[in-house]
Amino acid sequence: MKVGIPKEIKNNENRVGMTPAGVAELTRRGHEVSVQHTAGEGSGFSDDEYVKAGARILPTIEAVYRECDMIVKVQEPIEPEYELVRKGQLLFTYFHFACEKELTEAMLKSGAVCLAYETVQLPNGSLPLLQPMSEVAGRMAALNGAYYLQKTKGGKGKLISGVPGVSPARVLVLGGGVVGEAAARMAAGLGAEVTIADISLPRLRQLDIETPPNVHTLYSSERNIREQLPTVDIVVGSVLVPGDKTPHLITKEMLRLMEPGTVLVDVAIDQGGCFETSRPTTHSEPVYVEDGILHYCVANIPGAVPNTSTHALTNATLRYAIALADKGWQQACKDDPALAKGLNIVEGKVVYKAIADVFGLS
């Protein structure tokens, strides 16, 4: 199969769809891999490394889309890419369609096959292609929250760890999944007093056993969240409903319960966000203030650490990319029900129920 890896063009997105080591696995199996010129530079991979892995370098993004049957990316296509996607082409990347009507319409119109990393789902309910970026995003959420607590950045002027004789910052994590656990562990490691809220009692029991002593668990209800807000310094929103929009757990009205300078980090912004007042931001302009509360809502948090992120992503996606290239998407999805759950749009039709429900296409 002809596999293409274009350069990501989203704001400050320095990740790339595959490492040279991943490319080498595909070319070793006889597949033709084309990489756009400088696609890997942001992640620390030169064109020469891809050539040594057996790839050929194409000069433009247009050439990659034109010549390749399967496109392996990190981010969803954005508007300049819409017209490059063609009928029958397989796109293997993150999409997050539920909060992107324009993207959904463009991919339906293109006639492409859209296989989304974020909805590939194992029988135990885990999301193997979302997990590596969730682990990165959770850790970064805690670090960014700590950074913006500085008074010079608009925060309360608190050191997350405190010092002897001075209490540490208090961190509330909404959602006890992969992102939430990673955020809680990082914040706890920095010395914060952490509370992690979830609606699953079995998950809360597991977190209670497995996380450090300065991580506490809380059943997630509106009342319990409200009671936490007056004394919290950082809130990390990490709720996930696979393939669907995220519910708003903190409303605009609830902002008044928090002290000015509190930092909200919305990791779920690519699925609509956990906070009613969230709107997408970028690495260039990551924060804004509403009602005295800082909002950090960067949709591609792992893009700030692209070398780590690209290695982690390729580790997870490669086996599926190989199956798709070896067998074609139809046979690969027939053989692997987990991969089949990644099918969101197929040649003009929405085939993932949660997305169809959002847009009334059921």
Residue ranges of predicted features:
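Glycine-rich phosphate/diphosphate-binding loop of Rossmann-like nucleotide-binding domains
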Residues: P6-G42, T152-L240, V287
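Glycine/serine-rich phosphate-binding loop and adjoining beta1-alpha1 elements at the start
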Residues: K2, E8, P77-A169, V298-N300
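Generic hydrophobic/aromatic pocket-lining and core-packing "Φ" positions
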Residues: V23, D47, T104, A142, ...
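An N-terminal-biased, well-structured beta-alpha scaffold segment characteristic
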Residues: K2-A106, S110
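Rossmann-like adenosine-cofactor binding region
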Residues: I209-D291
